[in-house]
């Protein structure tokens, strides 16, 4: 049994970036993977306090909130796909808090050798989608995640109103392609390495 983690950064319930994430997770469900999908719109996660003397090297964050569910999912998963709406040409603040909080467990490197993909949705063309995708992938690389593209990079889309993305068959298809690519790489890694982690 293999496991995939989806993190939807949008503060909107059923936002466009979350819809694309669900499409990206479809291939995993079809192949019998176990899926965990965290919606930050339903969670309470505080920003990092930079209290390094309390978390550095301990693999434990002192903040008591819903982030502990995500911490538990990092070592559990074989793959991770993260989606974000674009705010001020970058990652939304809700997702940024999650990415920053990885610092508290960085020494444990729970995502090293996992396979990842990224999705970003903005209101307009050239609205910061590529910057957002790159920010997610840069974070993944710093965690030791093997980043996998969709057709080109991650999946980027333009959608200004709730549910707009459902009218864009091409983007929905691209999200599924991203999911398939992440799945294929993760399965090949598992076949070649077994339970061992990449160096």
Regions found by a protein language model. Give the residues of each.
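N-terminal beta1-alpha1-beta2 submodule of the flavodoxin-like/Rossmannoid cofactor-binding fold
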Residues: 1-105, 152-199
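Short, glycine-/small-residue-rich phosphate/pyrophosphate-handling segment
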Residues: 93, 107-153
